Amino acid sequence: MAQFSDIDKLAVSTLRLLSVDQVESAQSGHPGAPLGLAPVAHVIFKQLRCNPNNEHWINRDRFVLSNGHSCALLYSMLHLLGYDYSIEDLRQFRQVNSRTPGHPEFHSAGVEITSGPLGQGISNAVGMAIAQANFAATYNEDGFPISDSYTFAIVGDGCLQEGVSSETSSLAGHLQLGNLITFYDSNSISIDGKTSYSFDEDVLKRYEAYGWEVMEVDKGDDDMESISSALEKAKLSKDKPTIIKVTTTIGFGSLQQGTAGVHGSALKADDVKQLKKRWGFDPNKSFVVPQEVYDYYKKTVVEPGQKLNEEWDRMFEEYKTKFPEKGKELQRRLNGELPEGWEKHLPKFTPDDDALATRKTSQQVLTNMVQVLPELIGGSADLTPSNLTRWEGAVDFQPPITQLGNYAGRYIRYGVREHGMGAIMNGISAFGANYKPYGGTFLNFVSYAAGAVRLAALSGNPVIWVATHDSIGLGEDGPTHQPIETLAHLRAIPNMHVWRPADGNETSAAYYSAIKSGRTPSVVALSRQNLPQLEHSSFEKALKGGYVIHDVENPDIILVSTGSEVSISIDAAKKLYDTKKIKARVVSLPDFYTFDRQSEEYRFSVLPDGVPIMSFEVLATSSWGKYAHQSFGLDEFGRSGKGPEIYKLFDFTADGVASRAEKTINYYKGKQLLSPMGRAF
């Protein structure tokens, strides 16, 4: 067991006071949790395998602060370890464009993933543990432990009240993730006051039922020996994740300790001074770090971590010699590169090919891609036969003892846990090694995972949502399952690809974009109903996010659509010309995000000035204002019935589109029209 002495106590006091000083400097933040949690953080990081000079070393231990509001503690710890934080960075805590934002963000040194909304961090940690287990099972060889790292997380009462943590903790227990160790900061205080007002369950019994190893430390404010002993015991558990309940005092040492008042406000000046006196620091000085604390962390954490990194590098060089194929593949993944020519395996389609639901063309794409992309790891939230996310011959990611699969398997059975699936995918992506996670559910149920979807965009995790049954076209399941507002919501999220392909070629383009994406997640919305392979659909043009799929000279109107409505718009355009000699251009706009990043010249060549533009999409119209003068869509809930009959009910037919196109032309006749894309700034 690790030994602790006065230098450890000094290090903990330094952590506490640096955290308090940050909050004091900003006059904003959360001093309570750092004061109580500092001993836990010290114990974790004292044994953490990391290298601040190579923070992305693949075999490092991961640490996730799920209760991200206590990030002043994390920044203090990372500064002491020599990560790229100066004292001035700590002084700039919570200031605009600082490197120390109010909750941990991935762009800050040493921060594995953006956390803050409670419950997300522990769920991301489950994803990291899954990735590590898969990575180890794929690449480890006898005598060559390429991956044997742990994932550590700190969570609070609030994290464990959030539903997403229940989803992911349940799955982690089922998957027997012995590489996951979580510390539960039980301080009995919430923003409202005592947690007993709303939360009195036996958390450890719940986690025991999930299949976790459970432990308890009663005196977390200062009993580093017991914390360390529990951690070492947790490492012995190879077939269960571990949760260690540590009873702490929020705001330990403060005049307000043990109260809700110390949670989220700066301490008063006299309180800060008495804290510093209590722990032997000058009460009139701030951001003080004794040199012996820097030296201690360098000796106990930094130098051993550098040595382990160097030993790993030497081992990897030998590995590449002994296992050249695996070594080459692994080096490529560590470089963040894709296999040369991988895109040639994307299926191409012609108008002579059978009409297929885009969920089926998606299945063809995924089946081809998993053969050439070992970093592609997928699953579904208990909708595999509907999402068509599993390929023939797939091996499930399961504990080998269950005989249901193994840890080298790349198909994850998430169960009915959409939010958990999203947060886990974020963690898999954040693990590194170029992992490309995808997860399937109905488009409408992506809303269950809104928190994780938003954090994927904020944290820059390029995960892929395979979102089938993308409209009223799903039919009989009715309005509870039919998405209306969902795409508008997703399109409103910054840094988010939202693809709705019209046929097979556009589906291939959507996946090409999603797989190539560096720091932008993707939602691929796919139809349940069959759609024709369109005559002028283009993989290359679709990669621009929008293009002219049916053109005429001097159009009287432009119809712009996505997905299943593109073919209807083309039929409407032909009908308009055959019956009224009205000339209609049709534009397919499968991804707004990509289209918006094309040159102004290209965008205005597709949707120019001087022509009325009408959008047609059988979902909410609210996201179409910047592309169309008029929108035809569905701003009410759908109906239960056969898909084609529901389309007819709302007049979503070629005749219905043609009629509204004619009305749009007449309305704007004689008026000077600028493209809706035109903007002053």
Curated annotation (Swiss-Prot):
EC class of the enzyme, as a word? transferase
Sorted alphabetically, the keyword list is: Calcium, Magnesium, Metal-binding, Thiamine pyrophosphate, Transferase
Residues the UniProt record annotates as site (Important for catalytic activity): 30, 263
Q: Name one Pfam family in it.
A: Transketolase_N
| Disulphide-bridged cysteine pairs | none
Gene Ontology CC annotations of this record: cytoplasm; cytosol; nucleus
Any idea of its EC number?
2.2.1.1
Q: Which GO terms describe its molecular function?
A: metal ion binding; transketolase activity
Query: Per the entry, which co-factors are needed?
Result: Mg(2+); Ca(2+); Mn(2+); Co(2+)
Q: What else is known?
A: Present with 149 molecules/cell in log phase SD medium.
Q: What is this protein called?
A: Transketolase 2
> What gene name is given for the protein in this entry?
TKL2
